[in-house]
């Protein structure tokens, strides 16, 4: 899933999608002990929503993402931050540059999650922490219904292609095993329940269309077909007040680079 796809509708992603994950961001930043002066690397930082929360805790934040359009918004949100275009598999930083690093819902999209995890471990100081998050199992996330609605509209992945599935690391122990493969020592793990809430069905549809998967569906099958599929899939989650509320569960794991 290319960076160009994630950059098609960056403002909708920034305003309609990222804020829904605030409780997850806050929980993990607390687990990392992010505070005054922490040198934090946010890998796959998107439009910088989590970076702002980290800065509010006193962190000196560097964000990396492959999508320039999202980084433009991150710079608007946090002028004091440093935001760099780059790939998770080849971080453009010296060894031991950061006190801690975090990858919110990012490693599953890496070309090689193991390589990306090792890169994250490389740039953290000995004794420093790395946290990663992802969806729990698909059946525990109501938003899976919307992801599945787009599957028939997207092109089939090339044989052997990987790194494009939202649930690639969702099985129990998946994150922990990945971080261990990078030579990190487990510290803690847990789950965070979230409600993805939108005032209207149209907002819920726009949030999904702003993702890389949404952009792929539009490119392959047209916006009208993608909107229709998502609108239908969202109906079970419409409240009497007309809002859309989807209950999801995310996993996180925290590990330490050995001293």
Tell where the protein language model's regions lie, with residue ranges.
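A short glycine-rich, Lys/Arg-flanked "PGG" loop and its adjoining helix->strand segment in the class I
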Residues: 114-129
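A short SAM/SAH-binding and catalytic strip from SAM-dependent methyltransferases
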Residues: 100-113, 136
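Conserved class I S-adenosyl-L-methionine
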Residues: 1-38, 49-53, 69-73, 77, 129-157
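Class I SAM-dependent methyltransferase SAM/SAH-binding core
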Residues: 39-91, 115
């Amino acid at each position: 899933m290319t960076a160009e796809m994630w950059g098609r509708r960056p403002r909708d992603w920034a305003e309609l999608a990222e804020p829904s994950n605030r409780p997850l961001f806050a929980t993990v930043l607390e687990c990392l002990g992010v505070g005054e002066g922490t040198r934090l690397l946010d890998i796959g930082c998107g439009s910088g929503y989590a970076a702002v929360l980290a800065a509010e805790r006193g962190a000196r934040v560097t964000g990396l993402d492959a999508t320039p359009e999202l980084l433009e918004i991150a710079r608007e949100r946090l002028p004091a931050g440093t935001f760099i275009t780059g790939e998770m598999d080849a971080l453009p930083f010296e060894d031991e540059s950061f006190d801690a690093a975090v990858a919110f819902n990012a490693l599953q999209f890496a070309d090689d999650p193991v390589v990306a995890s090792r890169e994250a471990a490389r740039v953290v100081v000995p004794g420093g922490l790395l946290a990663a998050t992802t969806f729990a199992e698909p059946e525990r996330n109501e938003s899976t219904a919307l992801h599945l609605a787009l599957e028939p509209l997207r092109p089939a992945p090339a044989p052997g292609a990987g790194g494009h599935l939202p649930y690639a690391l969702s099985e129990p122990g998946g994150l922990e095993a990945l971080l261990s493969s990078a030579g990190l020592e487990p510290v803690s793990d847990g789950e965070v329940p979230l409600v993805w809430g939108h005032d209207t069905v149209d907002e819920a549809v726009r949030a999904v269309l702003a993702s890389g998967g949404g952009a792929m569906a539009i490119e392959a099958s047209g916006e009208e077909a993608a909107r229709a599929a998502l609108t239908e899939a969202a109906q079970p989650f419409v409240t009497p007040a007309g809002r859309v509320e989807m209950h999801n569960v995310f996993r996180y794991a925290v590990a330490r680079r050995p001293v």
